[in-house]
């Protein structure tokens, strides 16, 4: 899998303006991502999701994140996430490695 330190840099550059990862972190434009791995789409408590996110019904893990982060709007049409995605698979792997560590209990 990916490199956690490289993934942290990617998170800071591309994700942190809209997301937090720490336990009890605030929702911003996007939901707090703590507890992401193993959670179903559209389930962060207290965040207002689109119906598309709530109805997708997948569980976040390495494979689903790998596909989603390549092109969020293609994976969940109707998501309000405006991020275009990360085309390079090694960068997605690094980000996922960071998210697995940073968002776990």
UniProtKB/Swiss-Prot annotation:
Cystine bridges: none
Pfam family, one: Cytochrom_C
GO molecular function: electron transfer activity; heme binding; metal ion binding
Changes after translation: Binds 1 heme c group covalently per subunit.
Annotated GO CC locations: mitochondrial intermembrane space
Residues modified to N-acetylglycine: 2
Gene3D superfamilies documented for this protein: Cytochrome c-like domain (1.10.760.10)
Domain of life of the organism encoding this protein: Eukaryota
Entry binding sites for heme c: 15, 18-19, 81
Classification via SUPFAM superfamilies: Cytochrome c
Coiled coil: none
Keyword entries, A-Z: Acetylation, Electron transport, Heme, Iron, Metal-binding, Mitochondrion, Respiratory chain, Transport
InterPro entries for this protein: Cyt_c-like_dom (IPR009056), Cyt_c-like_dom_sf (IPR036909), Cyt_c_1A/1B (IPR002327)
Cellular compartment(s): Mitochondrion intermembrane space
The protein's role, per its UniProt record: Electron carrier protein. The oxidized form of the cytochrome c heme group can accept an electron from the heme group of the cytochrome c1 subunit of cytochrome reductase. Cytochrome c then transfers this electron to the cytochrome oxidase complex, the final protein carrier in the mitochondrial electron-transport chain.
Record PANTHER family: CYTOCHROME C
Family: Belongs to the cytochrome c family.
UniProt protein name: Cytochrome c
Taxonomy of the source species: Eukaryota, Metazoa, Chordata, Craniata, Vertebrata
